[in-house]
Amino acid sequence: MSEYTVQDYKFGQPRWCPGCGDHSFLGALHKAMSEIGIAPHNIAVISGIGCSSRLPYYMNTYGFHTIHGRAAAIATGAKVANPDLTIWQISGDGDGLAIGGNHFIHAVRRNIDLNMILLNNRIYGLTKGQYSPTSARGFVSKSSPYGTVEDPFRPAELCFGARGRFFARCVATDMSAAVGCLKAAAQHKGASVVEVLQNCVIFNNGTHDSIYTKEGRAKNAIYLEHGKPMIFGENREYGLMQEGFGLKVVKIGENGITEQDILVHDAHCKDTTLHLKLALMEGPDFPIALGVIRDVEDVTYNDAVHAQVEEVKGQKKYHSFTELLETNETWEIK
């Protein structure tokens, strides 16, 4: 049992709009950290720019509110320099996938041991309502008054395309599931991407309405758990089966279908094919997948860098710059 409580991680008074999903997520992060039990002074929360990027101010840990889109780059440097530090990187969909998109995919590709949280409300909130890389085609905003004419990024596709080893998804208002995803991300060694679906009550209210309430999730979402059959519905009456190279929804009890026929979720499968199909499911034909979709272990960038440094040091006469300066072959200029 952890020696820390939620209060040990709280700091300051959050200054977000009433009803903003950031409030719910902050509570989930405080709770997850208290259950994980890592001391606050061993944690750094690093963010970019945006509404969600104010989060480090409300954490009683080390924090760094950095520059637009560069949270992943700065978090990378911090982790490589101090591998014992637990790092939570916080970005919004605009900050993380537009100006920060390149940093995002390369941090994932390199498999740096970061907990990368993407708070996705499908809008630029801090700059007052422009469409973001995750806004739907046709979305009307201040920067697209006649509707966007482009398709959005889907974070799971970016993650898997960058050889991502961990991807989870939760809803900001679902405290229990969000805490579970955050704890799983922290336990995973490597780049852990958690997409948090949240609401912006001012500029994009209702963007995740189909699953934002408990009743909505019962009808329109599926909670994935490793080793368990993929069953969903208000009465757990539906399941997922494979059909060719795709998936199909079936009703348990019809046409002789039983729970034994339902696909069992394997989050640890190295192949991304099924994980991607699950992550891209959308209504009304399919439920939206929540929970840990992918969790595969692999060597991390930071471990590989430090192993390489030690190997090279073993082959050299001098093991550090300080040792080099302290040899007899130095002089003083007066």
What residues fall within each predicted segment?
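Thiamine diphosphate
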Residues: 51-125
